[in-house]
């Protein structure tokens, strides 16, 4: 659509990567830590964002505190927009996870 919209976001909700849902009504972010581009002190979360007026209302979906952000989670929506799929290394090995939204 080539329409640009800016939204206000709290500092700790910054993510390294964002993606939009297939219907373009929601966004997801993969969080980050103080050493990543996001530079968030308490941002180790998979977030769901819903645009409301000029801000993004966030919902924390997955606590990523045991994830090493050298592996980027790279969140994606499932084609039916019911799940967010991401990768993580919670237990030392890389795995693919899904969280229902």
Regions of interest found by a model, annotated:
Residues 1, 36-48, 92-100:
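Structural motif
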Residues 8-19, 55-77:
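Conserved blade-ending motifs and adjacent loop-strand segments that build the rim/top face
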Residues 8-55:
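Loop/turn-rich, solvent-exposed surfaces of beta-rich toroidal or solenoidal domains
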Residues 47-60, 77-86:
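A short, hydrophobic secondary-structure junction motif
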Residues 72-101:
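Blade-level signature of beta-propeller repeat domains, shared across WD40, Kelch, NHL, RCC1
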């Amino acid at each position: 659509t080539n329409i640009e919209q800016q939204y206000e976001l709290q500092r700790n909700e910054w993510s390294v990567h964002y993606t939009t849902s297939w219907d373009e009504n929601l966004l997801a972010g993969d969080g980050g830590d103080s050493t990543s581009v996001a530079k968030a002190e308490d941002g180790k979360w998979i977030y769901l964002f819903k645009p409301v007026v000029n801000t993004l209302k966030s919902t924390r979906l997955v606590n990523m505190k045991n994830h090493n952000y050298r592996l980027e989670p790279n969140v994606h929506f499932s084609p039916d927009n019911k799940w967010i799929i991401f990768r993580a290394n919670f237990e030392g090995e890389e795995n693919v996870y899904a969280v229902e939204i």
